[in-house]
Amino acid sequence: MTVLAAHRLQGAEPLLPSLQARLACRAGNAQQTAGVAPGFVQGNLAILPEKLAASFHRFCQLNPKPCPIIGMSDVGDPNLPALGRDLDIRTDLPRYRVWRDGELVDEPTDILAHWRDDLVAFVIGCSFSFEEALLADDLPIRHIELGVRVPMYRTNIACAPSGPFAGPMVVSMRPMKPADAIRAVQITSRFPAVHGAPVHLGLPQSIGITDLAKPDYGDPVPINDDEIPVFWACGVTPQAVIAAARVPFAITHSPGLMLVTDLKNKQLAVL
C-alpha cells in the first residue's frame, strides 16, 4: 500500500498537492513537472561531497541569477524539512543524473543506491515558479502549451568561478511577442529567488546559441514570426559546471524533472 493510500484510509486531512507529487515520484512516476502542483515552488538539485560543498556554495553566492539557493541539507541528511513534509531528497524527484569525473553515468528514478554519508544537497530556485505568475497575467508559455520540457541552452556568458567550479551560464528560453516580453520582464523581476528578470532578449547568436531548434537540454519549441526568444538564467547551470569541473562524484536532477517543495510561489515575490 502506498503512503498516499494509507493516508486516505486513515481519514486524515488531505495531503498538499506538493506532497502528493513527491509521493508519486517515490512510487516511480518519472514525468516532467512543469504545471505540477500549481502554486508550489519547484527546485533544481545538485548533490556534492562535503569537501566540495563550500566551494559550490560560494559559486552559487557569486552567481545568484542562475543559482539561487532555496534549501541546503546537513551533511549526510537526505531530509530537508524546511522545504517540505516527509521530504526525502533520495526518492522525491522524478529522475536523477549521476556524474563521475564529469561524465553522466546513470539516470535513475531514485538515488538510494548512490547515497553516501558525506553528501550535501543544494536545492536551487526554478523558473517554473515565475511561470505561474506569467500565466496568471495571460502570457502564453509555449512548452506548457505543448506539454514538453522547456528548452535550455549553454551560452557564452561566463559564470564567476569558485574553486573547481567555473563554466558557462545555462539559460531557458520562452518565445514571446515583444509586448509580452516587456510585461514578462516586469513580472519576473519580482522573483529574484527563482532567477528574476531575463538575462537576454532576441539575437541568440550574441550569447553563443547557434540553433534554437537544438537545445542542449529539454525540448525544442517553435517560434512564430511575430515572436522573439526570451532567455532566463537557468538552474541547470550547475550541471554544465559540474561536468566542466569533472568532479569525482555528483548527483543532479534530470532537466525538467524537478523537486516539488511545500513552499508557496507567492512567498518568493518581493513586491
UniProtKB/Swiss-Prot annotation:
It holds the Pfam family D-Glu_cyclase. Its EC number is 4.2.1.-. Keywords: Lyase. Transmembrane segments: none annotated. InterPro entries: D-Glu_cyclase, Putative_hydro-lyase, UPF0317. One of its GO terms (molecular function) is lyase activity. Belongs to the D-glutamate cyclase family. PANTHER family: D-GLUTAMATE CYCLASE, MITOCHONDRIAL. This is Putative hydro-lyase RPE_1692. It comes from Rhodopseudomonas palustris (strain BisA53).
